[in-house]
Amino acid sequence: DLLPYCEAIVSVWNLLGRRDNKYKARIKITVHEHGIDDIRARVEERFARIRPLFTGVDQALLAEITQAFAPPAYAETSLAAYDAARAANPAFRSWSDTNLSAHKNPDYAIVSVSLKKQGATPGDASADQMRVLADLAERFGHDELRISHEQNVILPHVAKGDLPDVYQALRAADLATANIGLISDIIACPGMDYCALATARSIPIAQQIAVRFDALKLEHDVGPLKIKISGCINACGHHHVGHIGILGLDRAGVENYQVTLGGDGTEDAAIGERAGPGFSAEEILPAVERLVLGYLDLRSDPEETFLQAFRRLGMEPFKAVLYPDKEDKRDAA
């Protein structure tokens, strides 16, 4: 039922979606304008008509796609070089702790190459760096690399024995930033610097946050924290599912940044809750710093992540650190 139901949703959106205004050519705008009940009724009616006509996916096409994504031929590999590098090189150990993910073959790893060096434009790579990545994919990655929605590059099949060489090549190309999943691994849309739809800048905000927390040397102490920044309501930066989401808006010609908390884009999906009034471009970095430092005080132990603490405590303790002036006025009253 899933595929025809998805087709029904797309068909209804195609029928009702706005074509007169590029700013409103989004399914969420259609749902907002027509209401979820009307959209649901239309989808169910369309699904009832097309479901009997669906006889299943084209098996030949499915087999062709499956073959295109077949796993490579894994070679047996020694882990000695990897284990020795972890023992002898703290920088390699830190990188492997953050930038490697488990592979279904225990002798291999999934390498996430961070394009989020502190102070750089999130997701940017130079032509020379792209050539290095292509060479690494050819030499060590079975000719495969992927671009993640988190604006990083993935080498999905790297033998652990080759990881020290991969790391050294990445380091030489200034691509060995060890921050995957940490504060400075920020998703940010192009914002007003490059996008005609944007109402606020995103890239400078991401750069300021990354530089600040690198200077504070708190990233690894804070642990997993997803900050996502969008420069307009189209939400290309996925701010609504950030642990800390930042939405840039235009308030009477002045950039204003709305903060949401508690979003999650994983299997425990949640839309972030708006914390309160927005902040100016000058205020948003101190606001994020207050949030993160407040979390360190609020968490039950060093293992409790920002998202876990938010789910345990709710919005109010975080709002108190985000808006200290309001709390001071409340105490004075």
Regions found by a protein language model. Name each.
Residues 1-333:
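Peripheral terminal and linker regions in Fe-S/redox and tRNA-modifying enzymes
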